[in-house]
Amino acid sequence: MKLQFSKIVLFIVITGFLYSCNSVKRVPEDKHLLVENSIYVNGKKNNTERINNLLFQQRNKKIINIPLRLYIYNAARPNIDSIVNANIDSKPKKRKRLERFLSKKQLDKYIEARIGFNNWLKTTGEAPVIVNKEKIEKSEKQLEAYYFNNGWFNVDATSKTDTLENKKATVSYFVKTGKPYIIDSLTTKIASPVVDSIYKVSEKQSFIKKNEQYRTATFANEKDRITKDLRNSGVYHFSQDY
């Protein structure tokens, strides 16, 4: 009896999985599944991990070029509890056939197993990534912020969405950086003679170098370095806002 029950469950699992191998099965009408992101920087494709991770939307993960987790998610049925019960109750012959092989307790466990397995499919799987205009705009701003913080102050990012057949789409991002800004000179203006003398002792350890490209992170590191150095030298209440 247990073997028969296991075969029934296995058959349901295999049938459901094969039926689910349609990547757009859970994509609503008038929506599109994101199948590819492409980033072009100054006309050249750049899909390095660092740049690609700036995007707010990534396509569904793939294993050997197969969106396996998406297929697993698609195998789940919406409202499975009502579907299972309605399916059995609406077909008296099916209920009698199940009751012939299963006891009342086993039938309840069968229904419980169907619902539990369906929930497992949802949590283990990955919902389809639907192209989202707001997230595309956020990605554009994120790309601009990244390049701005690395010295390209005139950066501009745009995008284009290409819809494909069968409710799929690709998104291309185009980044024009302009020329980078270079630090050509460094000057200091420190009102306190004590602070000025402490700063000059460690000035050679500065993260900011002449003729190097501007980077926001470099200036943040320098502020931290100066603050730590001054506090360690007795200027305990020094603030980075000074």
Name each model-derived stretch.
Residues M1-V9:
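Bacterial N-terminal signal peptides that target proteins for export
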Residues L3, N22-Y242:
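Interaction-mediating elements
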Residues V9-F11, Y110:
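Alpha-helical interaction segments
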Residues F17-S20:
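C-terminal motif of bacterial Sec signal peptides marking the signal peptidase cleavage site
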